Curated annotation (Swiss-Prot):
Entry's free-text remark on domains: Has the structural arrangement of an alpha-helix connected to antiparallel beta-sheets by disulfide bonds (CS-alpha/beta).
Feature type site, description Aromatic residue of the functional dyad: F57
Positions marked as site (Basic residue of the functional dyad): K48
Organism: Lychas mucronatus (Chinese swimming scorpion)
Reported function: Inhibits voltage-gated potassium channels.
Protein name according to UniProt: Potassium channel toxin alpha-KTx 26.2
GO MF annotation: an example: toxin activity
Keyword entries, A-Z: Disulfide bond, Ion channel impairing toxin, Neurotoxin, Potassium channel impairing toxin, Secreted, Signal, Toxin
Ribosomal protein found in the keyword field: no
GO cellular component: extracellular region
Tissues in which the protein is found: Expressed by the venom gland.
Subcellular compartments: Secreted
UniProt keyword Secreted present: yes
Amino acid sequence: MKTIFVVILVLFVLSAMLASSPDTTAEAAGCRGNCVTICRDKGKVGGKCYNGKCFCFN
């Protein structure tokens, strides 16, 4: 039972990391308030700027 729980937890963490992958187009744009717009143009739900990098949400 513990093994199944650990496997599910690891898969959840990996999927969360993949869902918020950085967007290189927004990074090149400087990520100054236009991150959400760029992510929406790419068909993503939205985005957030963190440490100068834009992260798009699926």
